[in-house]
From Swiss-Prot:
PROSITE patterns: LCN_CSAB (PS51863). Belongs to the long (3 C-C) scorpion toxin superfamily. Expressed by the venom gland. This is Lipolysis-activating peptide 1-beta chain. The keyword Signal applies. Has the structural arrangement of an alpha-helix connected to antiparallel beta-sheets by disulfide bonds (CS-alpha/beta).
Length: 94
């Protein structure tokens, strides 16, 4: 039982530390579409969201959206990513 608990905690810690892949959202809570864009566009968008990289993904049928690699869930949202980059925007610091 102790081994199972240690394994579970290890998995949670590794997922939290490494981040995951998420679709970043604009300030309007819409996804960044890439129907007419390239992977380079998505890579720039994702780096603004503090991800390692990004690419154009077509997981939703005909719709294409940018997907970020190794980004935290919080930073997948536009204003959260801004607050992470600029401490002056952080409400709790005021």
């Amino acid at each position: 039982m102790k081994i199972l608990a240690v394994v579970l905690i290890s998995v949670i810690v590794l997922n939290t530390a490494n981040g995951e892949n998420y679709y970043p959202q604009k300030y309007t809570n819409d996804y960044y579409g890439c129907q007419k864009q390239t992977d380079a566009f998505c890579d720039k968008v994702c780096k603004l969201h503090l991800a390692d990289s990004g690419f154009c993904d077509q997981s939703w049928g005909l719709a294409k959206a940018c997907k970020c690699v190794n980004v935290s869930y919080d930073n997948s949202f536009f204003f959260n990513a801004l607050e992470s980059q600029c401490p002056l925007l952080n409400k709790s610091a005021a």
